[in-house]
Amino acid sequence: THNYFEVLDRLADEGRAIISYDQLGCGNSYVEGHSELWCSETWMNELIELRKYLGLDELHLLGQSWGGMLSIEYLCDHKPEGIKSVILSSTHPSARLWAQEQHRMIKFMSQEDQDAIAKAEATGNFDDPAYLAANERFMLLHAAGVPKDTDPECLRRPKKVGTDSYITAWGPNEYTPIGNLSNYEYRGKLKNIKEPALIINGANDLCTPLVAKTMYDSIPNSRWELFDDCRHVCFVEDTDRYCRLLNEWMEQND
């Protein structure tokens, strides 16, 4: 959902319009009982139509995680006009590469957790308590933790999570992509992205340095910024640096 992006509202202090939205299937756009909608085509059409509706002839496009995947697809397959730059934040160009990197990081966990995850993937039973505990520990290491009372209100605010859309499109977790995005593969097309691209990831991110470097090496006009000690939400864990970086980047590419 858009909630956690509200930590970036300060970017509007520079006189920019900041637009974020809940994609169909989560948050304020949550709907039930339409599993046929949970695919890339739906969310791509949503982005295209939203841009038309708001008259966004020129913009800087920021895609975080799945949003970055959608941005890559948008630039490579639709070749839109008016994109001043793209910010690819903690995202990836390949479901296969992403899964490989998650499994590599799983090997640093306890043998008990490794076994629980391997068993779940082998049996298809993702409800076992041992697996659920292992997955929670994995996500705590590389994604994010439970918001604290001292965190900004937007992080603590109740939200409608798009679990159904996530499972249908991606899978039961970050390292088992068995949904309809399992064949997502854009490594060979990254060279066709002509827009300036800022690639951001955290040192402890689900988006590992290898994933980020793969994008950096392949996109001609790109810059890579690695955030030390950050997980999958660099913009939350180091908001000040993230905002400074984005302001600098957008000014350079206006």
Describe each model-derived feature in a short phrase:
Residues K84-F126:
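Flexible "cap/lid" loop of the alpha/beta hydrolase fold
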Residues T1, C26-S29, S94, C207, ...:
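Active-site loop signature of alpha/beta-hydrolase-fold enzymes
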Residues D57-E101:
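Conserved hydrolase catalytic core segment
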Residues T1-E32, E36:
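Conserved HGGG/HGGXW glycine-rich cap/lid loop of the alpha/beta-hydrolase fold
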